[in-house]
Each structure stands twice: as C-alpha cells, then as structure tokens.
Amino acid sequence: GVPILIQNRDPKVIIDTVRNIAPTFGAIKLEDIKAPECFEIEDVLDAELDIPVMHDDQHGTAVVVLAALLNATRFSGLMLKKSVVGVVGLGAAGMGISKLLLSYGVKNVIGTDLDVTACDRLSAAGGAVGSLDEVMKKAHIVIATTGCPGLIKPEMVRKGSVVLALSNPNPEITPDLALQAGASFAADGKSVNNALAFPGLFRGALNVRATRINNKMKIAAALSIARHAEENELVPSLLHPDVHKDVTAAVERAALESGVIKHWD
C-alpha cells in the first residue's frame, strides 16, 4: 500500500484527486474522512471507478463489529437476525455498521443521532429512528459510536442486553458499569480493531481483480473473523496465524460468487 495524504477537506478536491491517481492502483482505501463528506466521496468514486473503493472508518469497522456481534450473541443466547439492534451515533462508523447489519438480515435496526440528516440517511437505508431513551429501552443489542464518554448511564442499560460502547479512548459506558447494570455482555472499542478486516478484504479483492468490495464480501469477511475467535473472545487476535489468510480466501469466494470480477477483453 502507498499512503497518499490530501491536504484539503473539500469533497470535490478529494474526489478529483483520487479519480486522477486511480489508474496507478488496484484499489483505494479511504481513511479518516468525517461524515457526512465520507458518504458522498465514497459513493461517487465507487460509481465511477472500476477498482474497489472502501472507506475503512465505515466498512472495516462494520465488518469487525458484525464478527463481534456473531460471537457476543452466541455468548448471550440471542439470535442476531431476530434481535433489535440499537445504534447510538450515526456518523461514519454507526452508519456503516447499520447498513451492514441490515444487509446481513437484521430486521430491526433502530438508530439515534442529534443530526437530523444522519437519521434521514438511516431511514433511507431501511432502519428506524428513535430517541436515545427509546433505543436503550427497545434494543437487545446496543452499539455506541458517538465519541461522547459517559453518554450511556447505568440506569439506561436494559437487563440482559449486549452493549458495545466503541468510542476511543473513553467509551460511552465502561464494560464493568454496563455489566453491573445488568448487561449480559459488554465490551469497548479496544476489542474491535479494523485491522482484522481490511487486509483480507483488500487482498481478496485484489487477488481476483474485483471491481468493488460489496456487502457479500464484507459479510464473508465477518463470518471468517468470527470463526477464528477463541472460546471467550469476541474476535481473534490481530496476530492469529490464520485469520488474514482465511479472510482473504472468504472474500475471494464471495467476490467470485457475486460476479464483481473484472473481465478483460
């Protein structure tokens, strides 16, 4: 990979820059672009370019969170697809997580954000919108990505729920507090590292010359990551000897099966 820094925050400048350098590369990994600009930038580039374009803050996070939830629900006796999943904070990470959960088959995703346009974006994707109190009362699983330490008070935690408070360095509620308040399982952002996802996602896409990284490929990556976790782990260690190789293979298969392979004349 070649790191390229763009000293400009204008979405048009970023889009034009990436568009102009894209012929040099087999894929583009976008990083550290805030919402809502990240959505426009990725959508335009993904539509125009014939190589994979992926914003890691959205999709790398979403893949590892899905993997973590597959194991957390197993620990807690919940069925992910039948659970109500609450997403607190609908920025880049929260929106990416919401969309991937909906694609995976979770029927009830309810989100909350102070930004009305973020809530509208979730509604357009097929999710529901509510207040923070509504999300905390209804959700069997709560995922928080707000960047607001201490936002979730112990008295707001639903008994038996799964709570992933992912903001770093300080979460919306600490795992200890969530468990003391009655959560069946709780973790913070230190347990969920994007680096479990993006190496295999990009290596797999590049190996088969995929034109994009679609949801089937992301879900395949999440399933592979989840399988490698030890008995009491949410997700495996970054240093697990097989995880990146197996994620790569899973992504390759999903790309081939979903027909996003570049055909040469």
Regions found by a protein language model. Name each.
Residues 56, 165-167, 172-264:
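Adenosine-phosphate binding glycine-rich loop
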Residues 128-186:
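Rossmann-like adenosine-cofactor binding region
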Residues 3, 29-32, 53-56, 111-112, ...:
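General beta-strand structural signal in soluble alpha/beta enzymes
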Residues 59, 63-147:
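Glycine-rich phosphate/diphosphate-binding loop of Rossmann-like nucleotide-binding domains
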Residues 6-7, 32-35, 56-59, 114-115, ...:
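Short, ordered loop/turn segments at secondary-structure junctions
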Residues 1-83, 202, 206, 258-260:
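Glycine/serine-rich phosphate-binding loop and adjoining beta1-alpha1 elements at the start
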